[in-house]
Amino acid sequence: GSAYIFYPATGIKKIHGGNGNDFIVGGSSSDELFGDAGIDTLYGRNGNDILDGGEGADYMDGGSGNDIYYVSDIYDLIDDTSGNDTAYVSTSFVKIPSFIEKVIYTNGAIALPYWVDALLPNEASGNYFDTLLGSSNTFYYNFPIALPSYDTNASHGYGFKTFSSVQIARTEAALNYIASVIDVQFKKTISANGLNTFVFANNNQSSSAGSANYPSASMIGSDIYFDTSAINSKFADGSYAALTLIHEIGHALGLEHPFSYAQAGGGGLSDPPYLTGAEDSTAWTVMSYEDTSAQYYLNFSPLDTAALQYIYGPSKTARAGNDIYKVSSTAPNFIWDGAGTDTIDLSGVNQGATVFITPGYWGFVGSQKAATITSSGQITVNFGSIIENLTGSSFADKLYGNDTDNYIVGGLGNDWLDGWGGNDLLIGGPGDDELNGGVGIDTAQFE
């Protein structure tokens, strides 16, 4: 069962919660808190504490002092803003908040890709935004005629004006588009007073075109206000207002700015890490302030899609057939898929490639990866996508499967094929090939 354990006394304490959902509060000295199994809450309070939630999605707050956290689940959430803290991370692709000074990956764990990490605020750690929706995957939305009663921010009511029919139509078009990209649905509601509810309204803003809140456990989460300037009256394609609309919805879904410098027009600093150089551009993320008119439409850019699919997963109704994704050598390849039996095809590239069909990995055409994922010939599969098959080029490739049953064909060249998990069929093709089935009952064919 669940346990509530409090140790206010001084002296080092080693506390185990055992099975069940535990609430453990340490004392005023250095404690060692172990949640063990279950969904646990651990508070270290004072001292240099060790916190290990164990199995399950755990909340850990070391309090003051130099604390050590053990993270073993992608849903483990750390809240600690003081001291010099360390996290030992034994599972891959975890969002670690930037206020943890030292991160050590163990057990072969891999860090979250920088192009996703840079668009997620600290509040997104522990997959918090996804957990707010639960299994329904549903956001609600409302166009209030007055400032909602729960909103105590007086500035939100300054010049308050409800959305016009044109603004409503464009907003609903944006939401329909988003539901075709990520695994959420949007339902209109008659009341703004609810959790996971987007509020859309106009007001007077002195230095910004719009403002939005991240998702949260309070009703103010995901509320969006737009300046009453004329350009925002239509959110028309080809106008900056269209970019403003999709940008603010990005915030309301959980995306942050990618830049590390103060911006004119109210753009605040975001949590590190950051995108730099050419990647801090709306060509790659609509959350950037470095914009061009090519992005003045109701569409996310590639890095936005990658980050949002990390949070919510890809739409299960889009790209739902048996799709073939042909890799380009002259553009980056951000691959995502909703359903079906799908193939990544390297037959069109002019040199060997390294490809991982497990989401989150960084593949590339050529002998080595580029400096940035947005460079030509880079290859990655977005989180939540399942690709079953992989076809190599006419050159020497390194091809890696995933945990499903894969069909991997090397083609010409001296290839390396690795099935990873699942019951895989590996076909080397002509050339001196090396085949490794990995975990599962695998079949290898040589020519």
Predicted region positions:
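Zn2+-dependent metallopeptidase catalytic core
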Residues: T152-A192, A339, G348
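Catalytic zinc-binding patch centered on the HExxH motif and its immediate surroundings
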Residues: N202-S222, L269-P273, G277
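Acidic/polar low-complexity surface segments
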Residues: A9-T10, K316, T354-I386
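Active-site scaffold of zinc-dependent metalloenzymes
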Residues: F143-I145, A212-D237, V286-S288
